[in-house]
Amino acid sequence: ASPLRDVYKRQSIPLLGVLLFTIVPLVYMICIAFTNFDHNHLPPGSLFHWVGFSNFGNVLTGRMAGSFFPILTWTLIWAVFATVTNFFFGIVLALIINTKDLKFKKLWRTIFVITIAVPIFISLLIMKNLLAPGGPLNEMLMNFGLTNHPLPFLTNPTWAKVSIIIVNMWVGIPYTMLVSTSIIMNLPQEQLEAAEIDGASKFQIFKRITFPQILIIMTPTLIQQFIGNINNFNVIYLLTGGGPDNPNFYQAGSTDLLVTWLYKLTVSAKDYNLASVIGILIFTLSAVFSLLAYTRTSSYKEGAVK
């Protein structure tokens, strides 16, 4: 009984932490989604009460639908582009650095890894200042006569979305490059040499051997990155703050993701009920995609067979 009691004591503190900081806030958020707890019903001046599923109806089919679905669409577009570009260009960079004839391979790896060593919020704030209307990049372009006016990198909706994706590539590609490099360096050399002897081109070797090996190992990571990009608060908020403003959206800008919109609904608008609904929908979207995607991976199928 004594060893068992010791186990309970050791597990009680972590379980208490999970209860207080994960389960209780989650249950509280779910409950708030079924109330009218917003800026018009803030205790103690005004009490809120249960309203059932009306908040969900408001977001999905009511006046908030005009904001929710465009933001959801941009969130998914952003997540796809952010994940695919980092994966593709990370592999390309790894292949270039691992070319046999390339000199100073360690130096090139170190240069690209420096972006990982720098805290991401510092990189994003530097990029924000660099791309600002009066920033160094616009000043340089105008000094060289390439443009007569500052380019709207962060102030035009389309330019801002493209800029965000490019900046995210700068931050994320080195990580994919490192993982891909480790996979490439551990590929069976006998298999590669046999393919070369059989007359396979470099592209055929990449298509039939290298890329499938990278994809099998990195598929769970890609799923995780996609979900992470759906909830990528830092890149959007630190770079554009969700802007530029969009008069057609409620408390949201043209580059806001669902997660940054949720933040604004909570902190700025104090519409806690709507924010809770958005939080539940984000969780549902992420959970369903993760489950469907992971059950189709080779890792899951091999584990299921065993």
Predicted regions and their residues:
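A structural signal for multi-pass alpha-helical bundles of membrane permease subunits
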Residues: 5, 10-306
